[in-house]
């Protein structure tokens, strides 16, 4: 049955927010057990003794510099092994989409390539660093590792990244408190010089997804890492998303000049309005402004916080007659994937009958003006705030996105405004949960917030529960609820992955750090009483009442009490204009449960590790350059090692002695040369003088 066929009470309740009704503790299941475990906590709890906590070293135990030979191709083959949990498989595929959106790195199912990444459920979360040319290169996403930022972290290792705090200039930015580190774990805080870990001339990054947290390997309750800038104390160790510097380094390392699935972003700060054009076939124009008397008072990008900046596009319907239109068209865009997601913010200060139409103008051979296709009509009641919208597109040819403002009937005191447009070749979220006046809700005591009811694409009704009762963390849970389609659906609910994303409202989608969590409905999972956890809500749930008085059944919630800390929630642009957005997607991932046919590997010769036969002395590190093993020798401020195997020691004192000796030697040689030259010259002139004297004597003799 179509998921949009909802009973009247759900339609009515869609716009309602239930708050102040705490869920019974026993009616939610916390997948984290109330503990926010980092990668290193998980691995240590399993008794793993990995290099730096989550790195699997090569067989010879050596660390080598990341050079061209350690890089992967831009499209990396992978296999999702059958051992992986279903939720982990879906999370990994979502992580790949983050790489595609922000880098030129792509991933494809393995089809026999010589080297590929095998992702499996091992013990803990770990990876090797770089392409080790082993054929099948393992990367473990074990129990509790199925968080998207954890997957991003481990794949960054596989792509060649070390941990941020191990770089050579680490001590300029953080202080390692050695006596707070667990005995025997001190080596996890080693520094590696530039010959091992290349910072690519990018500043130290407190916000890196590759940085240890302040509590890494602690032997008590106090921090093992103290940031020299105190404001970053609770920032290090974030596991939300790539930082800007993570992306800068990754794109430099792999020579990325553009992102794969990103298409366009526009906040209208520049006068060229991102290459957009005003159509000639309309009766009015969109205007670039910084405020409108009737609203909005500021743009959405900067919220009026920056003087002489903060612009948006406005269609003034108050001065136009009914039926007037204004069309704003994007620059030409060239799709590659066949599906796109358009995102923008809309502010209506005009009439409730004013309308925004979203078109695509697709160009084909022989059609100069393109084919105009209506994608969405948006008509909303003016509520005095910016509203987020998503529009799914499916364009396969060269196209433009067209924003058409239409003056409707009735009185208007303002018009339509748009801002912060993003277009990418990604999937749009299925639903948006918009929570207004959030700081007031967040400041309340014993507060819980329920979302409106939603439907998945398969027809399952669900609701999200946000737990705000903790003074330190915010929790989030997914509930199945009774809906119009329950008689036609399969129960227990099989393999639906619910992804809940707290939106970072940065104007540019590439610079956002999303906070996201996914859970999957396992039809075999049981509750403590033996009933199926994801069975029909009317069978295993409890009865509740919507604000309009209509009863419904709510199943057990599944999620986490440590979705995000309150401190992180107040960072970035999660809360903007006192609004937050939770993006919701529920998709069927049952196809990931089947075993894919695995091709036979391409026959290859075993890769010879040239460093296996080279022993570098005095702490030197073996590297492979152009297929040859070389020793990179350590050096200090006034000393260094040199030689084929770093067997010779040098120092500035030796250099001074050599320089002085060389100078004296050169001076002595030059002096000798000068003396010899003078001697030879004088001897030459003496001979010439004697010859002249003899000639004069002979002439005198002939005269007589």
From Swiss-Prot:
Residues 63-257 form the Peptidase M12A domain. Residues 679-704 are cytoplasmic. The active site is at residue 154. Residues 607-647 form the EGF-like domain. The modification Phosphothreonine is found at residue 697. It catalyses: Hydrolysis of proteins, including azocasein, and peptides. Hydrolysis of 5-His-|-Leu-6, 6-Leu-|-Cys-7, 14-Ala-|-Leu-15 and 19-Cys-|-Gly-20 bonds in insulin B chain. Isoform 1 is expressed in kidney, intestinal brush borders, and salivary ducts. Isoform 2 has been found in carcinoma cells. This is Meprin A subunit beta. The lineage of its organism: Eukaryota, Metazoa, Chordata, Craniata, Vertebrata. The gene is Mep1b.
